[in-house]
């Protein structure tokens, strides 16, 4: 007996593996500080909690099946959000809710990718992108960014990576793990490269409201051509402090693709939790915007403190991110083997971080500042002492 061949292409999520190890160490009584998981430490906004409590007691729809794409009122709330925040006008039948944005991406690639199709992925990348592509039979093609461009790839790099087999350009903006945010002109340049092709853009915009001193531009909003070829993917896990609720969604003007995704979801998960859908409505309608902005301000304070302390540690350096809640820290001068470095850090300094190799780039590690400022300071102090006495 054995697993299907397609399972041989799939690797365990390194972020989840490290987070799990850190929790096991904590359970064993070890004082571990985890900066590994991209999980907001804030409580889900009160308005959302109250909405769900009320629905459980008074709404006959709570706990019932819903249409596969989602409740009509949830779809309308997503439409309103996309129009209000991003200037995007989608029809109700062009939106599908999913069990988090990871499920959204999985559905999109399952519906699009044939064996051998190439998907262009900027590197560093979120750990699950290439794994999902490979599982669907596709071939990840990486274009690498570095500190010289603030970890942003260029239109020229995209142009050089395109082949007759290219099916998708997969963009994450703001980016995990680097926090890179693309400008309107940079996105427009991607659009110019893609004109005249059948290449589809997937734009994962899950961190859109965790942004510092920049203006966010949804990819599909930049030009009519990009609107026609882009699948917008978003959710409430990061910006809305609802990671465990698992609420994501897909929006696209490509009716044939949305129809295919609905068909796929009807034979897999069907609808997402009715309670989660009801709870998402206040956030989608902008009723928790004040909470989201307060969280963003706190993230910004944490970012500034963490960047200053890390850049004072000999052997380490970090580019200040414009978005998300991660720092992608360079450790090449200490150890270019990021997996070894992070493993020793966890075992010897009791600080959990994620090795850069999981994001496609050696000599770096990622820390999340989605935790309280005192824990961040204590963790970085441990990292500094660890680096000072580090031996390969």
Predicted regions and their residues:
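Conserved N-terminal alpha-helix of the aminotransferase class I/II PLP-enzyme fold
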Residues: 61-98
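N-terminal alpha-helical segment of soluble enzymes
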Residues: 56-60
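PLP-dependent class I/II
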Residues: 3, 7-13, 18, 23-31, ...
